[in-house]
Amino acid sequence: AMLGGIRPGKVHASVREAVNGGAGDDGLLQRFGLAVWPDVEREFKLVDRWPDTPAKQAAWAVFERLNGLLPATDDDPQEWRFSPEAQAIFYEWLIPFETGIRGEELHPALVSHLAKWRKLIPALALIFALVDTPDTNGVIHEGELIRALAWAEYLRTHAERLYAAALIPETTGAHALLAKIKGGKLCDGDGVLWE
């Protein structure tokens, strides 16, 4: 798993290559299932405060507990499965999801991205179970799955936004030019400001 950030210009190039069959069309981009494309506020707001100490301590306790888990072996596998109720919810989500990604409406690059969610959704539910309900004898309940599905709903909007960077004609340059003209920062060939 990777966490981090990237500048929009860099990701635009990667997405264009992935969508247009260039060097970036190697499946790597589709593996960033937790990719988000947040809005940038135009007004800067300084936030300088002490971290929430109890929340920080609770998070570290989870990290320490997860770090103490014994890894599975061939002789002693650790199996987690959905409860019957969670399995029913998963199928209720999966069937229309699979139908949707097999349709004609979505770009193939976005379909490749979303197809990875067959694994991502159960993986998120497992993470939530390991964090919040680790003593359930390897059973992932509907609460953890519903949270994973809520994440999927949120992540889908960001995936669509990510791929739209290459699928919708680029207008960033036009917006920048218009801002300079409106701001009185653009001159003609004789040095006269445009209005």
Model-found features: residue ranges?
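Phosphate-handling catalytic cores of nucleic-acid transaction enzymes
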Residues: 1-195
